[in-house]
C-alpha cells in the first residue's frame, strides 16, 4: 500500500498457544483471497491448495523480497543445490508465503526482520497446504513459534 503497488495484503490470524491455527490473507487490489483453518485445509479463492506440484516445472522458483534482498538472502539462494535452473520471483507482502503454499514457488527464505503479524496468517495457510515455515538461525532450522514476549520473528524459510 505504502509502495503504491497492488501487492499489499490484509492479514488475519488466530494463534493458539505458539502456532497459527487459522489464517486469512486478502489482497484487495488483486481481489485474491487465501485462507486456512487447522485440520480443514487451505484455499485460494475457493480452490484447494496446493494448486501445483513442484515436479511439474523445469525451474526451481525462489520468492524474495523486492525491498529486503540482503547479502545473507543472496548467499542462501546461491547455496541452494538443485539440478534445475533457479528462477527468482519478486512479489510483495504475505503473498510470498502464499505463492509457496499454492505451489507457484518452491521456497521463500526471509533472512531479515518481520513481525508476528506479518507471518501468522500466511503461516497457517502454508501449513494446511502441506508446506512449512521454519526458523533459520546460524544455518540451523528451528521451530517457528508465536506469542513470544518480543513479537519480532527470527529469520525463516517457507517451503
Q: Predicted segments — roles?
A:
Residues 1, 72, 118:
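Glycine/Thr-rich phosphate-binding loops of Rossmann-like dinucleotide-binding domains
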Residues 75-82, 96-159:
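Oxyanion/phosphate-interacting regions
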Residues 1-9:
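Glycine/serine-rich anion-binding loops at beta->alpha junctions
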Residues 7, 39, 102:
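ATP/adenylate-binding site constellation spanning eukaryotic-like Ser/Thr protein kinases
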Residues 11-98, 147-159:
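Acidic beta-strand-loop-alpha-helix segment within the catalytic core
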Amino acid at each position: 500500500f505504502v509502495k503504491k503497488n497492488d501487492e499489499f495484503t490484509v492479514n488475519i490470524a488466530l494463534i493458539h498457544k505458539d502456532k497459527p491455527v487459522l489464517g486469512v490473507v486478502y489482497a484487495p487490489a488483486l481481489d485474491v483471497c487465501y485462507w486456512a483453518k487447522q485440520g480443514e485445509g487451505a484455499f485460494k479463492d475457493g480452490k484447494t491448495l496446493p494448486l501445483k506440484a513442484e515436479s511439474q516445472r523445469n525451474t526451481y522458483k525462489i520468492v524474495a523480497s523486492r525491498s529486503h534482498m540482503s547479502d545473507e538472502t543472496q548467499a542462501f539462494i546461491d547455496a541452494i543445490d538443485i539440478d534445475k535452473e533457479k528462477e527468482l520471483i519478486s512479489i510483495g507482502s504475505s503473498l510470498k508465503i502464499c505463492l509457496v503454499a499454492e505451489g507457484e514457488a518452491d521456497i521463500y527464505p526471509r533472512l531479515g526482520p518481520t513481525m508476528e503479524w506479518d507471518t501468522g496468517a500466511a503461516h497457517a495457510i502454508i501449513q494446511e497446504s502441506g508446506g512449512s515455515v521454519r526458523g533459520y538461525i546460524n544455518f540451523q532450522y528451528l521451530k517457528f513459534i508465536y506469542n513470544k514476549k518480543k513479537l519480532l520473528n527470527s529469520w525463516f524459510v517457507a517451503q
